[in-house]
């Protein structure tokens, strides 16, 4: 009896592999060109050396910065550090607007809500903590704790003031009702820690990147995985939607960033260099999508030409790993955060 079942399982695996091979073959037939070939005659970007400079240094954290996120007003940003503080900054004046003490200093992620009413954070406490910035209490206290993950919280992103998506080391993502503190949908299909999420511009989908070296596209309405993207050879640490919502970028421990197209269901470009041997911690796109910004373990932030796959600039200035970065929605600046306890705003 058991041998029959075992044989059926083996046959099912063979059938699945055969179908996958068929899908790959059909996809290759449709792939009549590559992005590199298509953009070969496109004029290169002008020299960027000295054009992008540090315009603001945000000093205030006393330990490694692990995460930052811009508000949609393009002025304020939130940062999370292992000094046990969540700081809300005015990026223009460099003033600290709020200093929120955390219950757990082992924080790994933070997020600003679209209305700028709330910020969220989480980490090794397995909890997503929500703070109301409109609260009259000082210091601001946690107003909601979302507690269902069985592993560390690696990333969180608001859809609106009432809903937030979290990813975790328990290999799942969860969509939460912030008001009630309850779980709406659990997304489970990864075979490794989920490290990063990025929500689509229309708020109907999100991308996740994980330690199983895959990125997955999820439908927030059905709760199902719609597409799986492979190609990386190590953990995916960062994912970010392309501005038009039809593609997304990834950064991995295999020392490469990649661009995947959702409609073509395939990888479009790799961003690598012989001199780059370290992992990528974070990725972001310029307003137009022509630049891909990537933070690296070697203390640098590299700027890539998205269409041609060439490195156009390397931003140096941090004294330790660049752990996070972000571009505001108006695309007017780039903020990098580092283990050197500093945030830098470039423009």
Curated annotation (Swiss-Prot):
Enumerate the subcellular locations listed in this protein's record, separating them with semicolons.
Answer: Cytoplasm; Cell membrane
Gene Ontology process terms (BP):
adenylate cyclase-activating G protein-coupled cAMP receptor signaling pathway; adenylate cyclase-modulating G protein-coupled receptor signaling pathway; aggregation involved in sorocarp development; chemotaxis to cAMP; chemotaxis to folate; cortical actin cytoskeleton organization; G protein-coupled chemorepellent receptor signaling pathway; G protein-coupled receptor signaling pathway
Single GO cellular component term: cytosol
**Main site of residence?**
cytoplasm
Query: Where do the WD repeat units fall?
Result: 60-90, 102-132, 148-177, 189-219, 231-261, 275-305, 317-347
Pfam family, any one: WD40_Gbeta
Disulphide bond pairs: none
Keywords, in A-Z order: Cell membrane, Chemotaxis, Cytoplasm, Membrane, Repeat, Sensory transduction, Transducer, WD repeat
**SUPFAM superfamilies for the chain:** WD40 repeat-like
Q: Does the keyword Repeat apply?
A: yes
Q: Which residues are the signal sequence here? A: none
Q: Which GO terms describe its molecular function?
A: enzyme activator activity; G-protein alpha-subunit binding; G-protein gamma-subunit binding; protein kinase regulator activity; signaling receptor complex adaptor activity
What InterPro entries does this protein's entry cite?
G-protein_beta_WD-40_rep, Gprotein_B, Guanine_nucleotide-bd_bsu, WD40/YVTN_repeat-like_dom_sf, WD40_repeat_CS, WD40_repeat_dom_sf, WD40_rpt
Report the superkingdom from the record. Answer: Eukaryota
Q: What does this protein do?
A: Guanine nucleotide-binding proteins (G proteins) are involved as a modulator or transducer in various transmembrane signaling systems. The beta and gamma chains are required for the GTPase activity, for replacement of GDP by GTP, and for G protein-effector interaction. Required for normal chemotaxis in response to cAMP and for aggregation during scorocarp development.
Q: How does it assemble?
A: G proteins are composed of 3 units, alpha, beta and gamma. Interacts with gpgA, and this requires phlp1.
Its family remark reads: Belongs to the WD repeat G protein beta family.
Q: What is this protein called?
A: Guanine nucleotide-binding protein subunit beta
**Species annotation:** Dictyostelium discoideum
């Amino acid at each position: 009896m058991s041998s029959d079942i075992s044989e059926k399982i083996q046959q099912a695996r063979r059938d699945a592999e055969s179908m996958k091979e068929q899908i790959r073959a059909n996809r290759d037939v449709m792939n009549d060109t590559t992005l590199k070939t298509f953009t070969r005659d496109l004029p290169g970007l002008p020299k960027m050396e000295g054009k992008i400079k540090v315009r603001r240094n945000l000093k205030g954290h006393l330990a490694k910065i692990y995460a930052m996120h811009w508000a949609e007003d393009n002025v304020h940003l939130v940062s999370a550090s292992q000094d046990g503080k969540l700081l809300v900054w005015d990026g223009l004046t460099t003033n600290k607007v709020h200093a929120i003490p955390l219950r757990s200093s082992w924080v790994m992620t933070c997020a600003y809500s679209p209305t700028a009413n709330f910020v969220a954070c989480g980490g090794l406490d397995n909890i997503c903590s929500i703070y109301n910035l409109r609260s009259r209490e000082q210091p601001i206290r946690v107003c909601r704790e979302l507690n269902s993950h069985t592993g560390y919280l690696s990333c969180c992103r608001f859809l609106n003031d009432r809903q937030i998506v979290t990813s975790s080391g328990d290999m799942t993502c969860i969509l939460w009702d912030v008001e009630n503190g309850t779980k709406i949908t659990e997304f489970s299909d990864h075979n490794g820690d989920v490290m990063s999420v990025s929500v689509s511009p229309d708020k109907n989908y999100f991308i996740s990147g994980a330690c199983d070296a895959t990125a997955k596209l999820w439908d927030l309405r059905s709760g199902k995985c719609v597409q799986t993207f492979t190609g990386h050879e190590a953990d995916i640490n960062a994912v970010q939607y392309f501005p038009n919502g039809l593609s997304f970028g990834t950064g991995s421990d295999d020392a490469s960033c990649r661009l995947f197209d959702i409609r073509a269901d395939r990888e479009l470009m790799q961003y690598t260099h012989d001199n780059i041997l370290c992992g990528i911690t974070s990725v972001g796109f310029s307003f137009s999508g022509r630049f891909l910004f990537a933070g690296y373990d070697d203390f640098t932030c590299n700027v890539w030409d998205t269409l041609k796959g060439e490195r156009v600039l390397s931003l140096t200035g941090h004294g330790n790993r660049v752990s996070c970065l972000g571009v505001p929605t108006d695309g007017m600046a780039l903020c990098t955060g580092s283990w050197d306890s500093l945030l830098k705003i470039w423009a």
